[in-house]
Amino acid sequence: MANYFIDRPVFAWVLAIIMMLAGGLAIMNLPVAQYPQIAPPTITVSATYPGADAQTVEDSVTQVIEQNMNGLDGLMYMSSTSDAAGNASITLTFETGTSPDIAQVQVQNKLQLAMPSLPEAVQQQGISVDKSSSNILMVAAFISDNGSLNQYDIADYVASNIKDPLSRTAGVGSVQLFGSEYAMRIWLDPQKLNKYNLVPSDVISQIKVQNNQISGGQLGGMPQAADQQLNASIIVQTRLQTPEEFGKILLKVQQDGSQVLLRDVARVELGAEDYSTVARYNGKPAAGIAIKLATGANALDTSRAVKEELNRLSAYFPASLKTVYPYDTTPFIKISIQEVFKTLVEAIILVFLVMYLFLQNFRATIIPTIAVPVVILGTFAILSAVGFTINTLTMFGMVLAIGLLVDDAIVVVENVERVIAEDKLPPKEATHKSMGQIQRALVGIAVVLSAVFMPMAFMSGATGEIYRQFSITLISSMLLSVFVAMSLTPALCATILKAAPEGGHKPNALFARFNTLFEKSTQHYTDSTRSLLRCTGRYMVVYLLICAGMAVLFLRTPTSFLPEEDQGVFMTTAQLPSGATMVNTTKVLQQVTDYYLTKEKNNVQSVFTVGGFGFSGQGQNNGLAFISLKPWSERVGEENSVTAIIQRAMIALSSINKAVVFPFNLPAVAELGTASGFDMELLDNGNLGHEKLTQARNELLSLAAQSPNQVIGVRPNGLEDTPMFKVNVNAAKAEAMGVALSDINQTISTAFGSSYVNDFLNQGRVKKVYVQAGTPFRMLPDNINQWYVRNASGTMAPLSAYSSTEWTYGSPRLERYNGIPSMEILGEAAAGKSTGDAMKFMADLVAKLPAGVGYSWTGLSYQEALSSNQAPALYAISLVVVFLALAALYESWSIPFSVMLVVPLGVVGALLATDLRGLSNDVYFQVGLLTTIGLSAKNAILIVEFAVEMMQKEGKTPVEAIIEAARMRLRPILMTSLAFILGVLPLVISHGAGSGAQNAVGTGVMGGMFAATVLAIYFVPVFFVVVEHLFARFKKA
């Protein structure tokens, strides 16, 4: 093939230009993302049982739905929560690659089977089945510049005018409002109700009657008289609109003819529909909307669309209303991709300089440089064809590919230059001869490297998706690189290179010194190799010791899934003791805000807090803060990284009394959890009951707290059992007094909860009407005695006459995992430990708990456990495939052994570099390790290929052949290896956005390549001679 293109250079150029055009078009159309669709798709089923406590919801709703979710294709695990507000949520997580649409349809079909078994009140409320991500993409906050709008004004405007348009924006899965729109609030006074012989149900029924939209029909409607001349709509009654109009609702007419109006027994006002959350931006009243990404949607596109929509809507905002973004994960995605692009350019420049240093000929150097954009753009075209995106993983693959793809072109150019110099041939003839010598080696390198990366494409789960991105990117670039090295590169060599002048090229002073030094080094290397081959047994023992060291390093290197990143944002949770009020929670959140805005003012840009909300559940004792940091360019230095900021905050905020305040970083993959660290589900496998499971959980937390050198921040991601005020109704006594149980329940529910009645019109929008006891009449236990129920004879009877009260404890939020009662435990690895170490430590602690208590990993930890199980198989398959590929290529069993023995030399370098830098054995390291395996084998192939050829064609002995081959190939091996090492150097020294991933990939590969080069050039000749002798003996035997 090479000879064909040497004679047709224009054709070679045409193919290269077509590849570049295709790649250019692909780049313009490829979507950009931080990661591909790594996270498995999730489907969430949400239901509401009004008035039910957590246990009732779990027994009558959650379990009924769970028990019908069997036989779903690709279901990995299922988690659920039931809370005291009557809410049930079941989240089903499916295998990566499962179609979210099909999963949603299957879940809906299974839900239909459960519907007849659910309470009627649940069915009336409706059950939703959503496919949005559980994680927050961004938060838009709304504030009043001059303070003219209070938090309820802001929240009402946002709920009425902004929430719905945003929820319809492309890519948005769901939105969550931090605040509430207005509602008509009817605050009842029990003493006045009793005075007029009224109960809450009377008020509700009259509101329903008098605040109603009636369809009055028409005058002159069809069918009509033949001479009918009039047609008009009849308006009978419309909905009320103001508190004054509601206050005039007639409740009853007394015997003396006087009227009792709603305002006589209640205070009527325009208030919030929901008072459960309080939002603040930098301590000022605010409202917010959390945007959650639709499953499979692109984060950057969605964020852009949301901001464009808000910008459009801002033209209609009240004068003082302003939008800010206190939490946005997309700037990190943009900047991290830009950083990798920058790394790509830096790698190309460094590779060019290395090639120029060794080739010392601009014409020769420009040829491999031309191959770089051709192959890279061609790879983008392939990525587009297979449906990939421009993301961190594919860009890392490109950076690694630069060192690989110039290798082929360097090998071609270097050998052509050698043939021109040694054989005094013109460039075209020299290129023909050179390609005959190295064509098989190029194919061998391509086969080996493709064989290394191919098994990665068949791994499963989120880890498999990461491997697949690297695999397809690297294999595509490698195959294109070999094609270019056998088409465009020889054509360029034949046309661009010049014949060697008499006496050879005259290098400048710098190159002359380099050449002199290199020639001396080459001679020293040749002499050293000859010495090594006289005592191969000794050096095989050294090799075995290196292998033993590799095994020790493997066991010593901590494991994790993905490295943590400084994403420019993080969160802080605050949890107060059970029963704490919103007033206390708001004060704690203000302390958190003050700390970040004063002690960390050089790093923190804004703080947005939400009282009453947390990932562990909703409640007055819960709070969450979204902290946005200043740009990375303004936070230079390790002390200003998110990790350092969190560590300082953890110490400072631990001093806040009567609250557990915990700052935490975001997970590497947003859709796989809400926090970094580990995520464990403690399971009640033995059906021990809620109390025993709580005791086991507390024991686990106590054991974990005793080992701060292993794990830190171990905490339950749930709500503690809270005091509950139980009203025991004596049904027999109530019946004897003529009081209906339904009336008792209605009175208690309305007074101490609230009752939704119907709707009213406010500023052209339909809003809700609620009836509830006034604040003074539902604050204390004694308030229960202020409420009366009318009996069958019309007499008012106090609740205390037929009921008793007592204090008890109960859970406001119950959890289940795969249909088993559970409690979620979150935590972080201690300094110097990886999440893999922390997970193993926690698993050992669970083994000390009472029988019947088990555990399971979920979220990011589930994927980490899965990846650690797959890694050994991946390494083994890759090595076997490489061995078989070499055996098939060389029609020999001995040559593959000579090549494969070099692999541990690269691996020990990768492990040593990773260990010295304090990094862990994560997915990026594993990809780097496979790259190291391929590159180690490549260097060995370059030497062994020439040795075999000399043995076959010139009849040399194995020792003579391998010494000469090693001498001849030393220069291209060092050149390609140094080019690759410097190509990944920008990854190793990267800092700022995305540096965690860049360091993880670059460090292992650089260390592995350095060791593989320095050690392999000495050990490959030893391996070759030892293997040839062993196989020769075997054949004789």
Swiss-Prot record:
Transmembrane segments: 10-30, 339-359, 370-390, 393-413, 441-461, 472-492, 535-555, 871-891, 893-913, 928-948, 973-993, 1007-1027
Record-level Gene Ontology MF annotations: efflux transmembrane transporter activity; xenobiotic transmembrane transporter activity
Matches recorded under Gene3D superfamilies: Multidrug efflux transporter AcrB pore domain (3.30.70.1440), Multidrug efflux transporter AcrB pore domain like (3.30.70.1320), Multidrug efflux transporter AcrB TolC docking domain, DN and DC subdomains (3.30.2090.10), Multidrug efflux transporter AcrB transmembrane domain (1.20.1640.10)
UniProt entry keywords in alphabetical sequence: Antibiotic resistance, Cell inner membrane, Cell membrane, Membrane, Transmembrane, Transmembrane helix, Transport
Cited InterPro entries: AcrB_DN_DC_subdom, Acrflvin-R, MdtF-like
Subcellular location as annotated: Cell inner membrane
UniProt xrefs under Pfam families: ACR_tran (PF00873)
Cytoplasmic face residues: 1-9, 360-369, 414-440, 493-534, 892, 949-972, 1028-1037
Highest taxon of source: Bacteria
Gene Ontology terms describing biological process: response to antibiotic
Main localization category: membrane
Cellular component GO terms, alphabetical: plasma membrane
Membrane topology: Multi-pass membrane protein
Segments on the Periplasmic side according to the record's topology features: 31-338, 391-392, 462-471, 556-870, 914-927, 994-1006
Keyword Membrane annotated: yes
Family: Belongs to the resistance-nodulation-cell division (RND) (TC 2.A.6) family.
PANTHER family in UniProt: MULTIDRUG EFFLUX PUMP SUBUNIT ACRB-RELATED, PTHR32063
Function recorded in the entry: Part of the tripartite efflux system MdtEF-TolC, which confers resistance to various compounds.
Subunit structure: Homotrimer. Part of the tripartite efflux system MdtEF-TolC, which is composed of an inner membrane transporter, MdtF, a membrane fusion protein, MdtE, and an outer membrane component, TolC. The complex forms a large protein conduit and can translocate molecules across both the inner and outer membranes.
NCBIfam families attached to this UniProt entry: 2A0602 (TIGR00915), RND_permease_1 (NF000282)
Protein name: Multidrug resistance protein MdtF
